[in-house]
């Protein structure tokens, strides 16, 4: 899973680990799983007015279309009860629990702190690039 923070950073920066992960996704070298909730969050965040001037419309639409076309749609797994810092991130935990790799790549690792207790690996973009690219 690429947390929304990584997608946004990758589309804005055009260099660095987040950008490399997004580029790898577009080039079919990184395969992502998603749920309808993740697709919705990507669409909602990328449509925010403050991102209109920094992320090209083609990129905003392209990542949604690419995810729908080549991503793995999974049924969300039940998320164990825990002291989750940001419940808005639970769709990513739910999807990670539903796939073999059980990995979330994020710029906000603290939001996923309890995930390790349930077998989910939380990586920074740099760690994700080293592990998956």
Q: Which residues does each PLM region occupy?
A:
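Short, well-structured N-terminal submotif of metal-dependent ribonuclease cores
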Residues: 1-34
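Active-site phosphate/pyrophosphate-handling residues
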Residues: 5-6, 62, 91
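Alpha-helix capping/helix-boundary segments
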Residues: 6-7, 38, 110-111
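Residues that scaffold the ATP/ADP-binding catalytic core of kinase and kinase-like folds
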Residues: 10-11, 45, 54, 115, ...
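Residues at secondary-structure transition points
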Residues: 16, 33, 55-58, 83-90
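PIN-domain endoribonuclease scaffold, especially VapC-family toxins
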Residues: 24-79
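Active-site neighborhoods of divalent-metal-dependent phosphate/nucleic-acid chemistry enzymes
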Residues: 69-109
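Acidic, PIN/NYN-like endoribonuclease modules and their adjacent C-terminal/linker elements
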Residues: 90, 97-105, 109-133
